[in-house]
Amino acid sequence: MNILITNDDGISARGIKTLAEKMSKKHNIIVVAPREQKSASSHSISINIPIKIREEKIEGLDCKAYSLVGTPADCTQAGISLLAKGIDLVISGINRGFNSGTDILYSGTVSAAIEGALYDVPSIAISMDVKWDRDDEDYSKAANWVSKVVDLAEKKYLKKNVVLNINVPNINEEDIKGLKVCKIGKSTYKTEYVLLEEDNDKVYQTSGVRNQVEKDESDLYFLSQGYVTLTPLHFDFTNFKELNEVKKIFE
């Protein structure tokens, strides 16, 4: 297949290099990623702003690669519409840290995959838990899992309007219990604001403590139990359970 690989951690991130190396063994790949770190940029795109694109060379990879001054969703757009032809699959990642629960609403990684689905291209987002005090993570187990999913999806399940969101726990590969297909859980943050300076503007540094809600059958729960999780996502936010009741009240 012709696969577009992107992320939100940037073109120099370890995760995207590991993913590209793994996928290039069986597929034709092109890498289009942000030039700088763009985590938590959600589904933002560049409007009325020139987009700069530069060809890059990723060590150890013999494929076309481009860095883009813009957002992860911009990268997917440019990859599909400008830099490549006939893309069969978009894979976004491997993200440094989970994109599970309601964190997916903030995620540039997931949004880059959803952008692919908006263009009618089957898409996958892949993320791995990390130890945040380290920057030498080994993403090979996440690459192995996404490769398994791609192999099976190519044979049995490639749908143009569906994103497969995969999360891999940060445990030894032999200790992973398997893969669970499940719904997303709910996770919120208690945000704290620390005043750094006060002049014309008050300048704050924010930090967040995660209030993780682990419910049975959710990705948050299964990740805590040592499973890889896979959740099918769609860009339609319609609350269909409430649609008829809201119609009765407001129409």
Curated annotation (Swiss-Prot):
UniProt catalytic activity: a ribonucleoside 5'-phosphate + H2O = a ribonucleoside + phosphate
Localization terms from the record: Cytoplasm
GO molecular function, one term: 5'-nucleotidase activity
Cysteines paired by S-S bonds: none
Main location group: cytoplasm
SUPFAM superfamilies registered for this protein in UniProt: SurE-like (SSF64167)
Keywords from the named record: Cytoplasm, Hydrolase, Metal-binding, Nucleotide-binding
EC annotation from Swiss-Prot or TrEMBL: 3.1.3.5
InterPro entries: SurE, SurE-like_Pase/nucleotidase, SurE-like_sf
Presence of keyword Glycoprotein: no
One GO cellular component, as annotated: cytoplasm
Annotated positions binding a divalent metal cation: 8-9, 39, 95
Cofactors required: a divalent metal cation
A Pfam family per the record: SurE
Co-factor: note: Binds 1 divalent metal cation per subunit.
Cited function: Nucleotidase that shows phosphatase activity on nucleoside 5'-monophosphates.
Annotated family: Belongs to the SurE nucleotidase family.
NCBIfam families the UniProt entry points to: PRK13933.1, surE
The protein, known as: 5'-nucleotidase SurE
Species the sequence originates in: Clostridium botulinum (strain Eklund 17B / Type B)
Phylogenetic classification of the source organism: Bacteria, Bacillati, Bacillota, Clostridia, Eubacteriales
